[in-house]
Amino acid sequence: MTSKTKDGKDIHWGIFDWVEWDENSPSQIFDDRLSLVEYADQQDFFCYHVAEHHTTPLSIANSPGMYLSAVAQRTSRIRMGPLVYLLPLYNPLRLIQEVCMLDHLSHGRLELGVGRGIVPYEVARFGVDPEEGRARFDEALTVLLKGLNDETLDHEG
């Protein structure tokens, strides 16, 4: 979906989604959300982004790659991505593989978003000291960018 500004510039519309809990079963919530994304794809929305949250009522899509692979299979045009993968929770090499696979499954429609996370208890539940979050993020981002942009990956950390 595209609109124009007063001076003629394009505005591309997208959706940011938490896939939050409601009174329905998780299966029904996912089915409803996937139908919504299919509709957005048909209506020419530019992109669909999903949050990653853990152990909160904010989201049941706590595995963005898995959820977005279902989105990719049900759509053909809309761009998609996580906003954000919580880098302190991931092994960077494993995430590189997931990102590449998701980009292939979506036929190049992946929009990659990464971040540190803002809710300390979410990362703490995975044994990550929130005080170490910045350092873990910085190192993971370095490895991720090398892995996605260089022919070989060589990193000691």
Model region roles, listed by residue range:
Residues 62-64, 75, 82, 107, ...:
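Short, solvent-exposed loop/turn segments at the edges of secondary structure
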Residues 60, 84, 133:
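Glycine- and other small-residue-rich loops at beta-strand/loop junctions that grip anionic moieties
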Residues 2-10, 91-157:
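Internal, glycine-rich beta/alpha segment that forms the wall or movable "lid"
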